[in-house]
Amino acid sequence: MVAVIIKGNEVAEKKRAQLTEEVVKLKEQGIVPGLAVILVGEDPASRSYVKGKEKGCEQVGIYSELIEFPETITEERLLAEIDRLNGDDRINGILVQLPLPKHIEEKAIIERISPEKDVDGFHPISVGRMMTGQDTFLPCTPHGIVELVKETNLDISGKHVVVIGRSNIVGKPVGQLFLNENATVTYCHSKTQNMKELTKLADILIVAVGRPKMVTADYIKEGAVVIDVGVNRLETGKLCGDVDFDNVLDVAGYITPVPKGVGPMTITMLLHNTVESAKRAGVVCK
């Protein structure tokens, strides 16, 4: 049996086409969704991510604004900019590209963004709403992962989901989203003993640890859905995930590739959240 490849880029394109239609309808009502992205410093990876977000906005018809600051910006000045954007009716979503310089406290910056414009889903209020199953902006990568699993037509309810990784951005929230879908969730991390015994029980295995090709066929239950969140660059310059793709292909039922797996879904869910925020605000642009 060879696993079915879940092509995240194709799923993302399908969802972006739906978002484009929604944006057209909103614009007919005078509502233009707007996203502001704040970039601090000259980190090439951050700039590349921001470019992808701008391109996504342009594709679906969202107004986007890039606000750039030098690495020397003070925390106070950055907080003042967020306050300005919180009060700007043209902006439905505010995103601060992480990481930030060491002299700026990320927690203070994230908490300053209005929960109504927190399209990244990182604000403690958004996290609390997600934990309690309330309607909120879901974190983009975890939300994208759940959508990819749903593409397999597998009924998530009652399934055993194992998450390798416990970061605040992916590991912890993705487990909670599957719990909200009535799955049974197990977390594995660097201190977990007998990890393979646990992962072999997984109907759905999520891997987000940042270790190239860590997960091999002996981690996988036959027929499982395997979602590889890792993006690692090998010495050859080639990208690979946390899962040894070729090794696992004959055991898994479904698997995401790297690249063109989870990555395209992250920006797509950000666009989704921005459109949702515009719908909720319902502000007609003058």
Swiss-Prot record:
Gene this protein is translated from: folD
Q: Which reaction does it catalyse?
A: (6R)-5,10-methylene-5,6,7,8-tetrahydrofolate + NADP(+) = (6R)-5,10-methenyltetrahydrofolate + NADPH; (6R)-5,10-methenyltetrahydrofolate + H2O = (6R)-10-formyltetrahydrofolate + H(+)
Pfam families tied to this protein: THF_DHG_CYH (PF00763), THF_DHG_CYH_C (PF02882)
This protein's species is Bacillus cereus (strain AH187)
Q: Which UniProt keywords apply?
A: Amino-acid biosynthesis, Histidine biosynthesis, Hydrolase, Methionine biosynthesis, Multifunctional enzyme, NADP, One-carbon metabolism, Oxidoreductase, Purine biosynthesis
Q: Enumerate the residues binding NADP(+).
A: 165-167, 190, 231
- Select a single GO molecular function from the record's annotations and give it: methenyltetrahydrofolate cyclohydrolase activity
Q: Under what name is this protein listed?
A: Bifunctional protein FolD
Instruction: For this entry, list what GO says about its biological process.
Output: L-histidine biosynthetic process; methionine biosynthetic process; purine nucleotide biosynthetic process; tetrahydrofolate interconversion
